[in-house]
């Protein structure tokens, strides 16, 4: 197994540095030929989404499509693809990808509530993200 960093993932998608994009593509092709998995860590996905939004001004639709394609490719593996899919599904509609991934992780770990002052998250998950806890929640 090998891991890809954010800059490699971005080069693969954006192809703004032809030499680096080709090198990443060679790694992917070699991994496929040799049945080697390429792991993409959640932190790399968070950083990748941030770079695509902030630096390259990619649309939410394009980023969502990229993430879905990445998750569907057999060569790539993720520590918890179900959690990542959940975050991507919410990200398609609205929200910050990092926050959505954090909430998905909290749910995976069976947190009964998610305490946050983030109003946008509260709107997306009104019964789960709260800024006040009741005694029954503890």
Model-derived features with residue positions:
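Short, well-structured N-terminal submotif of metal-dependent ribonuclease cores
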Residues: 1-40, 55-61, 133-138
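Alpha-helix capping/helix-boundary segments
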Residues: 8, 44, 83, 101-102, ...
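Residues that scaffold the ATP/ADP-binding catalytic core of kinase and kinase-like folds
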Residues: 11-13, 51, 124
């Amino acid at each position: 197994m090998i891991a890809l960093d954010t800059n490699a993932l971005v080069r693969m998608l954006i192809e703004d540095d032809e030499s680096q994009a080709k090198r990443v593509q060679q790694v992917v092709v070699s991994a496929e030929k040799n049945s080697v998995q390429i792991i993409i860590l959640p932190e790399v996905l968070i950083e990748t989404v941030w770079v695509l939004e902030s630096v390259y001004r990619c649309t939410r639709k394009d980023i969502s499509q990229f993430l879905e394609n990445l998750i569907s490719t057999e060569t790539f593996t993720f520590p918890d693809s179900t959690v990542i899919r959940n975050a991507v599904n919410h990200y398609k509609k609205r929200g910050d990808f990092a926050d959505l991934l954090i909430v998905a992780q909290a749910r995976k770990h069976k947190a009964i509530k998610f305490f946050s002052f983030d109003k946008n998250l509260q709107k997306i998950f009104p019964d789960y993200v709260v800024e006040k806890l009741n005694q029954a929640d503890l």
